[in-house]
A protein has these predicted regions:
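Short aromatic-glycine-enriched beta-strand elements
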Residues: 180-185
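An exposure/low-complexity boundary signal
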Residues: 2-3, 7-12, 153-175
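Non-catalytic linker/capping segments at the edges of enzyme domains
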Residues: 49-117, 145-146, 161-162, 174-178, ...
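Active-site helix/loop of acyl-thioester processing domains in fatty-acid/polyketide metabolism
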Residues: 5-18, 87, 118-142
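Terminal domain-initiation and capping elements
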Residues: 1-60, 78
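Hydrophobic beta-strand-centered segment that forms part of the acyl-chain substrate-binding groove
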Residues: 21-28, 53-65, 131-168, 195, ...
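Residues located in well-ordered beta-strands
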Residues: 83-86, 151, 156, 170-172, ...
Length: 210
């Protein structure tokens, strides 16, 4: 009947908030938008926990999908503030970027003298730039857009990053991009050791609307 069909469409629409296809069977008893949304949120939390700290094996000798020149065709950042050197993987929902942490970087002498440690804010910016590549890679004219931070949450710095490290970041969409709003989870690694992580919200805006 019409009421049952309406409820079924509500379930389908609410579960679409997960941002992934469900491979399985869903049985709904007395569904409603509120309980549907809570169920979708619970599934998203399970997916996030399952993916935590998972980084695929990477071959640093393999030619990257994008080098710095390609990256600069997508995001507006330029040296010395271009913090992502290479993109190793990219899809509609995730990106893996690489940063070679060098002795010659401007912060090395002062943060801290004799014991250089990469500032956490630069690790966040590295993840943000990788996220910018992920998002702007979805539009045909990325040179006409800018990405602005809206919010950072759950940021943690677990281990130090030092000159000589090859820093990897992995960014994943937490939910589909809607109305130019992006919600992402990011992590950085050296080897299989997690260095930092956080969740980020950003918005893409056309330059001519500023």
């Amino acid at each position: 009947n019409e009421a049952a069909r309406h409820k079924l469409l509500d379930v389908i629409g609410d579960l679409a908030l997960i941002g992934m296809k469900i491979r399985g069977k869903v049985t709904a008893e007395k569904p409603g938008h509120s309980i549907n949304a809570k169920f979708a949120q619970k599934i998203s939390e399970v997916i996030k926990a399952d993916r935590k700290n998972i980084l695929p094996k990477l071959d640093f000798d393999k030619k990257p999908l994008m080098d710095s020149n390609h990256i600069m065709n997508i995001i507006p950042h330029r040296p010395p503030f271009l913090l992502i050197d290479e993109v190793l993987e990219i899809s509609e929902s995730h990106v893996i970027g690489l940063r070679r942490v060098e002795e010659s970087e401007s912060w090395v002498k002062g943060h801290f003298p004799g014991a250089p440690v990469m500032p956490g804010v630069l690790q966040i910016e590295f993840m943000a730039q990788a996220g910018g590549v992920l998002v702007l890679n979805t539009v045909p004219d990325p040179e006409n857009y800018l990405t602005f931070f809206m919010k950072m949450d759950k940021c943690k710095f677990k281990n130090t990053v030092v000159p000589g490290d090859i820093l990897i970041c992995k960014l994943e969409l937490i939910s589909p991009i809607r109305r130019g709003i992006i919600h992402m989870k990011g992590q950085t690694f050296v080897g299989d050791e997690i260095k930092s992580e956080g969740e980020f919200m950003a918005k893409i805006i056309k330059k001519d609307t500023l």
